[in-house]
Amino acid sequence: MKYESIKKRIGSDKMKKIFFLLFMLILSISVSSKNLKYHPKTKEELQELIENESIYLGDIDTSAITDMSDLFIREKNKIDACGTTYEYITTKRTNFSGIGKWDTSNVTDMEGLFYKMKDFNEDISAWNTSKVENMISMFEDADSFNQSLNNWDVSKVKTMKNMFRGAISFNQPLNKWNVGEVMDMEEMFEAAYKFNQNINSWNVSKVKNMSYMFNSAKEFNQPLNNWNVSSVEDMTCMFRYTKKFNQALNSWNVSKVKYMEEMFFEAVSFNQSLNRWNVSNVKDMARMFCDAKKFNQDLSMWKVQGATDTVNMFLGSPLENRKPKWEGQ
């Protein structure tokens, strides 16, 4: 009985400490928010503060903001005096120091957040992205951005379409990301010229669209053999214009893929076996290996349907004059 009483007291003391620590944490967050100068409640209010260059971004309490989509876009579809149409005009602000301190814990939409922000390169590695579901075009055409993002929680993100498209300087590890809920990776690294990181551990089992994913990713040459692509339906131009990519893909389950048009178009280094692929559902293979200068693999075992478009499939490749013979083709 004496020992049971001691155990209860110890347990009670532990619970008190836990509750005390939680209370202090909540209190510190509350106090830190109150110490900030500005407390916008909507995206529009936040944008007004951003446009005032005398305001230090680190003084803004963003804890109430749920939508940061197109945050730094001032105008869309503007026509100037000469009749020139500008699709997007970004903020005039040039100093973004303090943005790394923002509380993004309630943000669900970050679509186009840094779109066309040519000079932006601030450290935002500490951002809480645990509620974000949309990262479409988040760093698209952010020419200078090259900061660590590997510790971000992206577990609720459903679409990363165009996320790093045209982010010509970005080359940071992303191997820790949990992309298990993502369904769309179209153009994700298109024209991300320097990106060459190992993302073979990604769970891409829910992704349906990988079209243009590495299109023009000139430096990319990392293994992808562990990817589960069994849900993917579109691989159009996936590795087009990849100058260095030459990795094993034969283990991929491509049985649901319908579109492989220009998939390896001008993938000038690629020469890996693909004989195990089940391409029975593919409708379009036009120019699939066109100008793939080194591709010289046996594809005779493929079951290509008669209605499948194979126009110029091997044009400019070593197989141009000895195309595989498939039934019905």
Predicted features along the sequence, with ranges:
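Sec-dependent signal peptide recognition
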Residues: 16-22
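Negatively charged
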Residues: 31-329
